[in-house]
From Swiss-Prot:
UniProt protein name: Potassium/proton antiporter CemA
Organism: Fagus sylvatica (Beechnut)
UniProt KW Protein transport keyword: no
Membrane topology label: Multi-pass membrane protein
Gene Ontology biological process terms in this record: potassium ion transport
């Protein structure tokens, strides 16, 4: 009976780990055709207006340069100019298709992640008892560690999250989240988040050490500051 009670939280933990992957895969496959049909049938006007977005505008600037080139080479035979116009037209159609696919990708992945978040939130609420057991296991494990190991672990995590080399890791992580939600890569937004998150985490860490660790384990704080210096 005790083994069965211990197994249930472990199974719950495994389901928490693999459930997001399964939800994302299943809903992406099931919603893909529906989102594609909805966008293709009802969003053509929005698509033609949205084509002026910054990511697509660069391509059309290139096409405009080709038109200028067309004016400069009017002495070429008419067949050559006709091929040039056809090439520009085909390139324009291809850009519209690419932007159309990007919009579908964004809607599909954003919807899938929202559904995944709602399901996981409900699953966590329903599994509150298992979460309490897992939390007690974690607290017991941390309590049995020595202050030196705890200080080393805190120092390692802080260096990884807010250390000198952490911005590159944050950039990769935030870029991955952006891609997972289907958003385009905006360098300015990502740079702003990368420069903000470590500062916020550093402030939270210092407040946590001051308010919590000083009261619970003063010796741990002393060891941490000694190792950090």
């Amino acid at each position: 009976m005790a083994k069965k009670k211990a197994l249930i939280p472990l199974l719950y933990l495994a389901s928490i780990v693999f459930l997001p992957w399964w939800i994302s895969l299943s809903f992406t496959k099931s919603l893909e055709s529906w989102v594609t049909d909805w966008w293709d049938t009802g969003q053509s006007e929005i698509l033609l207006n949205a084509i002026q977005e910054k990511s697509i505008l660069k391509k059309f600037i290139e096409l405009e340069e080709l038109f200028l080139l067309d004016e400069m080479i009017k002495e070429y035979p008419e067949t050559h100019l006709e091929k040039l116009r056809i090439g520009i037209y085909n390139e324009t159609i291809q850009l519209i298709k690419m932007h159309n696919e990007d919009c579908i990708y964004t809607i599909l992945h954003f919807s899938t992640n929202i559904i995944c978040f709602v399901i996981l939130s409900s699953y966590s609420i329903l599994g509150n008892e298992e979460l309490v057991i897992l939390n007690s296991w974690v607290q017991e494990f941390l309590y049995n560690l020595s202050d030196t190991i705890k200080a080393f672990s805190i120092l390692l995590l802080t260096d990884l999250c807010i250390g000198f080399h952490s911005p590159h890791g944050w950039e990769l992580m935030i870029g991955s989240v952006y891609k997972d939600f289907g958003f385009a890569h905006y360098e300015q937004i990502i740079s702003g988040l990368v420069s903000t998150f470590p500062v916020i985490l550093d402030t939270i860490l210092k407040y946590w050490i001051f308010r919590y660790l000083n009261r619970v384990s003063p010796s741990l704080v002393v060891i941490y500051h000694s190792m950090n210096d």
